[in-house]
């Protein structure tokens, strides 16, 4: 009978949970410069030696987000030590923090869609008809 999840998936889920907790609770006391950060995904290598931790920041300023990412990178040894204290593994994977751009990209696409819909409504209004009338004719 095949397992539902591989070992790397299970370790990745546990690392995701523990890192999120560490960043929200313990790390805030060590470095208060770090703003609101969320762990969005974790990728673990097949040999469990390396892990990429994708993080999202609730900021719009690129410079501030880069600063937050550098704070995490500077303290990844400390974070790895905290992770080792929480997990039962012979060797805890080396950590690399990566900024997850999916949230900002999703917001950008949503804004483009809204902008396009507003332009379509404006064109329909200028042509003397509403967009709702066009949809009812189809």
UniProtKB/Swiss-Prot annotation:
The record's Gene3D superfamilies line, in alphabetical order, gives: 3.30.300.20
Q: Check the record and name the PROSITE patterns matching this protein.
A: RBFA
Keyword hit for RNA-binding: no
Q: Which Pfam families match?
A: RBFA
In terms of domain of life, where is this protein from? Bacteria
Stored InterPro entries:
KH_dom-like_a/b, RbfA, RbfA_dom_sf, Ribosome-bd_factorA_CS
**Looking at the keywords, is Cytoplasm present?**
yes
Query: What is the protein's major site of localization?
Result: cytoplasm
**GO molecular-function annotation terms?**
ribosomal small subunit binding
User: A single GO CC term, please?
Assistant: cytosol
| An annotated GO BP | maturation of SSU-rRNA
Q: Which UniProt keywords apply?
A: Cytoplasm, Ribosome biogenesis
Record localization? Cytoplasm
Its subunit composition reads:
Monomer. Binds 30S ribosomal subunits, but not 50S ribosomal subunits or 70S ribosomes.
* Role this protein plays: One of several proteins that assist in the late maturation steps of the functional core of the 30S ribosomal subunit. Associates with free 30S ribosomal subunits (but not with 30S subunits that are part of 70S ribosomes or polysomes). Required for efficient processing of 16S rRNA. May interact with the 5'-terminal helix region of 16S rRNA.
NCBIfam families for this protein: rbfA
Task: List the HAMAP family.
Answer: RbfA
The family this protein is said to belong to: Belongs to the RbfA family.
User: By what name is this protein known?
Assistant: Ribosome-binding factor A
């Amino acid at each position: 009978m095949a397992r539902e999840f591989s070992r790397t998936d299970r370790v990745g889920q546990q690392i995701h949970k523990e890192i999120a907790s560490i960043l929200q609770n313990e790390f805030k006391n060590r470095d208060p410069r770090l703003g609101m950060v969320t762990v969005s995904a974790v990728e673990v290598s097949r040999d469990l030696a390396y892990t990429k931790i994708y993080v999202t920041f609730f900021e719009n300023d690129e410079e501030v987000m880069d600063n937050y990412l550098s704070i995490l990178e500077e303290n990844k040894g400390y974070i790895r030590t905290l992770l080792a204290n929480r997990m039962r593994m012979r060797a805890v994977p080396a950590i690399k923090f990566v900024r997850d751009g999916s949230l900002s990209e999703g917001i950008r696409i949503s804004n483009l869609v809204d902008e396009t819909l507003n332009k379509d409504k404006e064109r329909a209004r200028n042509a003397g008809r509403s967009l709702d009338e066009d949809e009812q004719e189809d």
